[in-house]
């Protein structure tokens, strides 16, 4: 359980992806490619720009953010990746992001905002999503030991305690993972994790 980074090669260039594997709940995968944007798949469904997921998590955590505020959570290449993701995103608000994600996960165009919001809140609630204590510890130790983090807020998230609340995914976890993807993509000799040796 935790987050794992893997590399793929596209047209002779190496790109990294991340898998967030909980003990219980949906797998979240983030991938990057030549357009320097980050895309997300939840439970291997259709991908969408990571900016929609960032908006939804900010809203669920009762700290809604404008697109500019989302970009300011990042520095360097990670900020560029988020800006590029925003440019690819059809959704332009938290409500639209809930709807877009719901459509991709449920393969349905018949949805209202209340249903989409309820679905996402439930999907990542403690009752349906659990990183486990081990998963949270792995996530925290990875980002405590892998500089640089974008800002103090991301570093604070990486040192969260392993309470029941600490065993769910947070906006700052997503930010730390995006930062790591950008760092790996911009590090010449970076290599992915060997998942067989992480047990």
What are these regions (language model features)?
Residues 1-199:
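N-terminal non-catalytic structural scaffold regions of very large proteins
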